[in-house]
Structures are given as structure tokens and as C-alpha cells.
Amino acid sequence: MRNVSYRIFLFVLIFSPLAFGARDPLALAILEWSCVFGAVFYLLALKGNATPYRVPGLLPLGLFVGWLVFQAVPLPATLVKWVSPATYLIYRENLGPLEEFSWIPLSVYPGKTLAEGFRFSAYLLFYWGTVQLLSDRDKLKKTVLVVAGLAGVMAVYAIVETLFTNGKIYGFYAGPANNTHVGPYVYHNHYSGFMGMILPMVLGLYLYYRPQARYGSWRERVVEFWSGAAGHLHLLLGFAAVLMGTSVFLSLSRGGVISLCLSMICLVGFFSLRKGTSRRKRFVSLSVLLILLSVSWFGWEPIVERFGRAFNEEGKFVNSRFTIWNDAYGMVNDFFLTGTGVGTFEAIYPGYRSLQGQKSVGHAHNDYIELLSCGGVIGCLLVVWFVVALFRATWAMYRKRRDPYAHCLYLGSFTGILAICFHSVVDFNFYSNANGLVFFFMCGLAVAASHTRLRGRQETFLADSTPVHKRVTWVFTVVFLLLVGVYQGGSLRASALFDRVDGTVVSGDTTLQESSQVIETLHWAAFFAPLEPAYPFALAQVFAVYGEGDMAKGWLTQALRLCPVDSSVLQYTARYASRRNRKVLGRHYFERAVAHDAANPDRRKMFAGWLLGAGETDEASLHLKQAMLLDVSKDNIKACISLLLYHGLSKETIYGMLPERIYPRFVFADTMSAFGHGELAREAILRAMDYLECDDSLRPWHFMKIYRVYMTEKDYDMALSVLQRASEYFPGHPKIRLLTGDTYLKMGIPYRAAEEYEQVLIVDPDNRRATAGLKRLSSYL
């Protein structure tokens, strides 16, 4: 049974990173089931009165898992109001108008929080199993070599993929859009996080297996080195370490590169603390040098360019992470004690978002900030307790050990833990399913390296646990097995059912048979995954189409009960209430939808349309103006202008509502031109010059559009003045200089035109238009 448990242990350790980082729901389910079955088989191997070993930090880790479950289960509303007033307010404002409630959870998305509880329960069992299994010295040595080999193979694949790739993982999986995949990972930062944990361990093994050939001639030393198995393994581990470090640099993960460098400094420092390790310190430094030389062979230009993107034209360090972290401060302030529920960042963040753009933000890109905002102070303290307990138990034992293998392996594993902790300052590695598993493997490895005895009859310095601990472990494992089987099995089944009808358009023209099939499928999906709000929301939309108002309301209530901060559901509820002539309720839910997704222009446009229909033009104007500021794309601005025109607002009024930027004026002009108002379009374009000082997103073509209007009217003086203003903002821009030369030529000032053409050729020597212009002017000069 113990061998079966060990095989499962190795399987999940290898499978998770190779399965695209175990990001797919099926891969996560396999990970969780493997962890629990591995624990079951190990417990079955403990016959009679035999008990497992005590595991450092298991109590705080178990309490952390319990805290996640506690966040997800319904509690008396009065208790929630007392410990988390902000959570109570959300449920009161978003769910209260539809139904009275007396029990609510601390989490604003209990389904996500419970899923995180299951994930960390699997990690807990895996950590426990790692400590138990690696107390066997043979399994310990075998496991670390298997992991080193896995990381080496992944590094080779990542490097080859970087050089010869079709843009897909394994040649067939494209991964999600807007992500840069490296190796088998869909996100390059997660790949570098994985390698950052494993590389120090591999270097530790590399140092341990260094052949001890200190006497004899150089020839004898070389022969002894190549004839021994240790010498071969030493070279293989060193080669793997160089490949792994090189692949981190080639991944272009800035956080990964920085954390790798910091971890190497720490590893050298740790070896410096022990006497007689100066040679090992030199070997680590040599490995780092070889990594840098290897990167030089591939070229530093992409890496330098990647780091250069972190600075703007003025040399200031800019990154959207800073904005997200600043926004998260508001979340921490509102949910300081209990958090919003671990795993709910993506759901709650839109209500605090000030980040420009419409790109979805799923995580804080800082695991510590996300833990504090979603897990609260209670969750943070439990995590700190676990880390302190782990460090105290392992460091104290490491200091007592005299075995070089224990020293090298412990320092390598401990440095790997530090590497992921460094990286987590700027990324969300603990929300990578595979990296979370590997982190707890490294924790278990640190315990095993410091406690497992490599000689003698006694396996480990770990103490045996009591029979009570064994029974508690059995109960936890069996309960988790049942719950995760039901939860993951139901989630996978519900997802498969939903995929059958996802994208199906249900309307009044849909046949009864088709609509009945859709409703039945969604009912089953909601049955198999009762904590997923997407299925009740879909049912509410279907019933609303067929005028089943009470059924639609019931399913909307259920969706809000499961996630009261979903702005899509809140907005649909507002529309539902408005159609039933409940204007006060409709307005309330429109306001809640905007409040929980303030940076989404679509929420504001929908609310503004409702306000315009109700005759509340002033408030609608404010929302539309904000919507245009949030998204300055042509489609969005045109949609806002069209909405105002549809509701009968005058063109002058609409122009006055535009944001104080240039581009919205151009879109307004294009819209007016399409409706045949050419003079109004001309005026809008020319008046855009009044907003130069207000616009921080000026582009050269903004000036050129105004310039063309004057050139069409043959007003060369005004056209020239526009180009001169453009040169103040974009000095040396070849296109602006070229147009300036053309304008001077039309004005009959050839020598000034020649000067401008010459300036163009200084910046762009191959510019054909400037060269041709100078040739034409040669007869005049």
C-alpha cells in the first residue's frame, strides 16, 4: 500500500506541471483526487497500532483550511454584521430587496472560496504525505532526482520551444488569449515560479554529488571523476541547473529573473554561514556565471527590452500592478478582519477598480496583498503561523545535522521556498494549481531533508503522532474524499452540460422543444453545481424571455445569493424590475451594478439609457461622460453619442458633454458628417485644438486630421500653425516635418521647405518623399 501511495505521489508531482500547470478544471480534479487517494493508501499501510509521524505546521495549515470553509458556510446575519459590516452591507443592498435573509456567508462568492478550501485541503494532504513518504531515505533520494530530471526536461523543452515554436504548447494547445506561454505553462511567470523553486534544490544536489578527488595527479583526478557514477550525476545536475536558470531568463519574466537572482544570493549566503563550505559557495557562483554566459549566447536584447518596458519615456517606473495594489487598499480597509473570501478577488475587485482599460483582472499580482484582502487578518495570521512553525522545526534540526546530504538538500529546498516568496511579491504563483502543489512539496522536502536519517536503523528524527491524530487524519481524509468527489464530479458534469447550451439564443421564436431542452439542461447543471451562480442566472434569462416573471425572479435571487457582487446579474435584475414597472427597485439595482463595476463603461451606458428614458438627462450625461473617459475607443464613444441622439438631445448639448479630450471630438465630427452635418463636423474638428493642454494621450495624427481640414480649404497659414504646434509636442517627427515642408512649398517658400526636408532625412535617411522634394527644389535653390 505504501508503494501505491508513493506512485500516486510521484504521478501528481509530475502530472501537475506538465498538464499546463493543472489550470484546467479536470486537471485540478485529478490533482485533488490523487492527493486524497495517496493519503488513503498510506493510512491503509499503517497496520495495527502504527501511527504516522508528526508533521510540523500541520495545525495552522489545518486551521487555515478550516477558515476557508468557515468563510464559505452561511452564518447568522447578526454575526456577519458584527465581524464584517461591509459584507453584511453587500448582502443587504444587493440581496435584501429581493428576499429577507437571516443566514449569509462571510465570502461574497462562497462557491469560489469553498473551491479554494478543497484545493488547500489537497495541498495539506500532499504536504502530510510528502513528510511521511520521504522519511524513507531511499524514497527521499529517488524523489529529488526525479523532480530534478522533470525540471531539466521542462527547461530543455522551454528553450527549444522559444527557438522553434508554432505558438502552441506541445504543438496543439494555444492556451488563453493575451498570455505568454513558456514550456508547458500557459503563463510565463508561473513557469519561472516553478523553476525558481526547483533550481536551488538542484544546485544543492549538484554540490553534494561533487566527486571528492583531492589527491593524486591531475590525470588520476580526471580518471576518477569520469569513472565514478557520482561524477556523471554531478555533471548532469549542473547541466540541468544551467538549463533551468537559462530558461527563466528566456521566459522574460521580470519577477522570475529578480527572484532567481535573490534566491542565488541567499543560497550563497547560507553556504557561507557554515564552516568548510567555501568550495560549495564557489561552485554555486560558478553555476550562476554559467547561466549568465548561456543567456548571453541566446542574447540579452529581449531581456533588456522586457525590463525597459517597465519605464516610461520620462524614465519613471510604471506598472499596472501599482494601481491594483492601491485599489486593493480599499478592500483591505473594508474587509480587514475576515476578508472577502479567499478566491473572490476577481469578483470583488471591479467595485474598487481605478485601473484604466477593459482587461480583466483576476488577481492582485501580489499574493500577500490578495491574501490580506480576501483572507483577512485571520487568514494572514494562520499562514504566518504555519511558516514560522515550519521554519522553527526545520532550521533547529538542520543546525544539529552533520550529514552533508541533509545540509545541501535542506538549504536548496529552503532557498526554493524563499524564491517563490520573493516572486509572490509581484505575481500570483499560489493561485497556480501546480505551483501551489510544488510549494508544499518543497515544504515537505525541507522537513524530510532536516529530519530523515541517511544511516542507521531509525528512519527519521520526527516523533510519532498519537492514535488520536491518526483517527483525526482518517476522518479528515474520508470526509474530504467524499466532499471533493461530489463537488468536483458535480462541477465537471455541470460544466459539460452547460457547454451544450452555451451560446444558444433563446427568443420568442425558439420552438417549445428547444427551449424545454435548454431549461432542462440548465436545471441539471444548477443541480450538479449548486454553488455556481452562472446557471441560475442563465435560467433567469430564459424564463424572462417567456414572461415567467416569478420564475425569473426566483433564479435571479438565487444567483445573487451565490454572488451578490456580480454586476451582470445586478444589471439584469435592474432591467427585470424596470420591465415590471418597479422603477425604484430598477434604479437601485442599476446603481448597485455601477457601484460594483465602476470602471466598466457598459454598466454606465445601460444606466444612462434608463435615465434618459426616465427624463433624468443631467445624471445620464454624467454617466455617459464617465463612460467615454473609461473607454476612448471609437465604438464606445460613437455608441454614447448615438444613445444621446436617439433620446433627442441637441447636437450642441451632446458636444458640450464630450470629455475634454481631442479624440471624442473627432468621433463626434465623423458621426455628424455621416448624418450630413458637414459644417458642424468641421467646427468640431477645428475646436479640438482647444483641448491640447487637457489631453495626456496626444498622437501626431490628431494634428494631421486638423491640418487636412485647413489644407482642403487652402488655408495654408492655419495649416502651418497646426503643424508648428504639433512640432512642439513631437519634435523631430518625420511625418510632421514632411508635411511642414509640403506646406511651405505650397506657400511659395522653397528654402524653408528644403530645410524641413533636410530635417526629415536626418531622422529618416531613406525617406523617398523628402529626397524627391529636395530634387524638385534643386532648381529653385
Positions of PLM-derived features:
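Alpha-helical transmembrane segments of multi-pass inner-membrane proteins
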Residues: 3, 7-19, 29-42, 61, ...
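Juxtamembrane membrane-water interface segments that cap and precede transmembrane helices
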Residues: 18, 94-110, 172-184, 319-323, ...
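TM-adjacent membrane-interface loops and short helices in multi-pass inner/ER membrane proteins
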Residues: 71, 130, 187, 322-361, ...
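Aromatic-rich transmembrane-lumenal/periplasmic boundary elements in polytopic membrane proteins
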Residues: 72-92, 160-172, 182, 301-334, ...
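Short extracytoplasmic/periplasmic juxtamembrane "stem" segments immediately C-terminal to an N-terminal membrane anchor
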Residues: 90-95, 177-178, 311-325, 499-521
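Hydrophobic alpha-helical transmembrane segments in integral membrane proteins
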Residues: 299-315, 466-512
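Soluble catalytic regions of membrane-associated enzymes that act on cell-envelope
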Residues: 352, 357-359, 490-680, 697, ...
